[in-house]
Amino acid sequence: MKIVVIGGTGLIGSKVVAKLGEFGHEAVAASPKTGVNTITGEGLAEAFAGASVVIDVSNAPSWEDTAVMEFFQTSTRNQLAAEAAAGVGHHVALSIVGTERLPENGYFRAKLAQEKLIEGSSIPFSIVHATQFFEFVPAIADSTAAADGGTVRMPPALFQPIAGDDVAQAVVRASVESPLNGRVEVAGPERLSMDEFFRNALSALGDPREVVTDPHTRYYGSELDEQSLVPVGEAVLAEIKYADWLGRTTAGK
């Protein structure tokens, strides 16, 4: 089965392409690097010809509110139009747990707008909602670090991050099964408060910064409540724990 992966050269996309190949599918990595541009439409018709499934794991180059909204809306509209023309039977998109819970967050708003376009199209679809990735833990810590570099501030909101490999596996699973015409939520196996998680994580990383609990610390511009970033209903729990993932990642360097 031919499956096109939009964003197929990125962190999650490259893993998705590799896993699809392992299962014997014809996986096409589509990105500007390979001549496919979902904003201009360049290369979409050629990439989608003969495809059964299109997976979108692409990300916006800018997270500025207007830019990120324009990216996801334009990219998604162009993909859906090209899929309809090519007879693609299943659109799979990776999104975020909690898109509907942080309306003041420009990135989350843009992802929710993307989902609404997919839901309103004629293409059968599956949306995979994932929690935050282990791979981004250092960047999240840096985003709330004090100017003096000695502390990191974190709210006590619940946090249930997941390994990129497990996200890719969930996306692949959705792509080879029948369209959900709905969404599935995936999360890591461990749920902790953010402050507790980051104390453990920074210690494991050998990062000496102190983690200070602050309920008003903003997560990329948004103040969180307890359940902003975690599944509140049924979810598929991944297997890889952060400590195990970090050990493998460190050993692989």
Predicted segment positions?
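A conserved pocket-lining segment of Rossmann-fold NAD(P)-dependent short-chain dehydrogenase/reductase
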Residues: 125-127, 139-162, 166
